[in-house]
Amino acid sequence: MLDKLFKLNERGTSVKTEILAGITTFITMAYILFLAPNILSLAGMDKDAVLIATALGGGLVTIAMGLFVNYPIALAPGVGLLAFYSFTVVLGMGVSWQTALGAVFISGLVFLVLTLTSIRQMIVVGIPASMKVAITVGIGLFISIIGLKLSGLMAISISLSPNTLGQVIQTHGNLVPPASEALLTLGNLHSGETLLALFSLIFTALLMARKIQGSLLIGVLVTTIVSYVTGLSTMPENFTVLAVPDFSKAAFLQLDIPSAIHMGLITIIFSFTFVELFDSMGTLIGTATEAKIADPKSGKFPGLGKAMTVDAIGVSAGALLGTSTITAFVESAAGVGAGGRTGLTAVTTGILFLICLFLAPLVSLVPNAATSPVLIIVGALMLGAIRNIDFDDWTEGFPAFLVIVLMPFTYSIANGISAGLIAYPLLKIIAGRAKEVKWIMYVLAVLVIIRYVFF
């Protein structure tokens, strides 16, 4: 039965190999069960609610990928978009988390429309490779800075203008001092929490240097244990490892779609969709090629359209359940490396995610010092793609540079993408190489300019 459903013999694998591959994938990406609640709680969401949405959404969508597409690919809330959701949209723009979920839901529908039509192919072909790579690298730097800040390894110090003291005296101390500069500085290395995060970062990096499977998860677990052993964290009373999930805390259907439309979050929705599209496409093609399901040289990608459809539905489903963008995880490559070739690998991973619904008490124990280094390391991994950008060609390198630096330093994925979309066609025109630019890039550039001028 399983052989017929998943084509095990045809793809040269077995039930045992597929299950072990599914377990391997789960181990390498299980850190998201600790990371997502910690990041989204900063946006005002309940940790237990986020865990339920992450485990349930990731589990169901991953199982769907296995059953309907037969790809060994797992899905869960994407790290970069978790950070974008919390730090840019909610904390940066002052949007409620319900409205932000509404924007995620809409982006999923847009992604689905793009996937089901030829527009997807136009965008994928029309966006230059340097821009696609730059988006990945920029998001990597973005989440690394967030990880450094959350860990305490980096601090933001405020420099006051010279006449601030006089203004405060004149207003009898009632003036809120204006800041002339906000500087990124080294954090307080005398803080126990900061030192714990530093230990976690170094320990996890050493594990990865040894190529130990599940390094990120091991790092989170060991750091959490150290936190309680050293007294930096205290165990809650009446603690139990397992508990029946409290669905009354879940954020099911708490998204606010009308507000997302009314507030004109077009750029935010566009950014979510843009990143979803290229993250999904890159991960699916890369993993399917590694699993020998697809052949990029011949252009054969059987099931790619169906896989992207499941991914797109997963985005909106995640928002309905109460979590940020659910997308294909690059960690799926670990399962493929362990021999995974079919959807049985994904189904195994999905079932393990569902089992984790009962681990809410355990997740609540994990401190920021254990999860923030994960952001730094994932960012470092994403940075490796920069080698594929041709910086010798100014018309390719400079737009990519703008994307990369503006994402972290303006705390916005949207700003980085927008700058690149404007700069790329502009430089090509000035260089007399306008024919190298696909028409879709001109359309996107005009839309971005209109957004910044009129909205």
PLM region spans:
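Helix-coil boundary and interhelical linker segments in multi-pass alpha-helical membrane proteins
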Residues: 38-49, 88-99, 263-266, 367, ...
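Hydrophobic/aromatic residues within the transmembrane alpha-helices of Major Facilitator Superfamily
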Residues: 23-30, 60-63, 67, 144, ...
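Transmembrane alpha-helix boundary and packing residues in multipass membrane permease domains
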Residues: 34-38, 54, 62, 83, ...
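Helix-loop-helix hairpins and the membrane-proximal interhelical loops
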Residues: 1-50, 182-186, 218-305, 446-450
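Loop-to-helix transition at the N-terminal end of transmembrane alpha-helices
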Residues: 44-63
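Helix-loop-helix junctions within the multi-pass membrane cores of secondary transporters/permeases
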Residues: 2-32, 36, 57, 78-87, ...
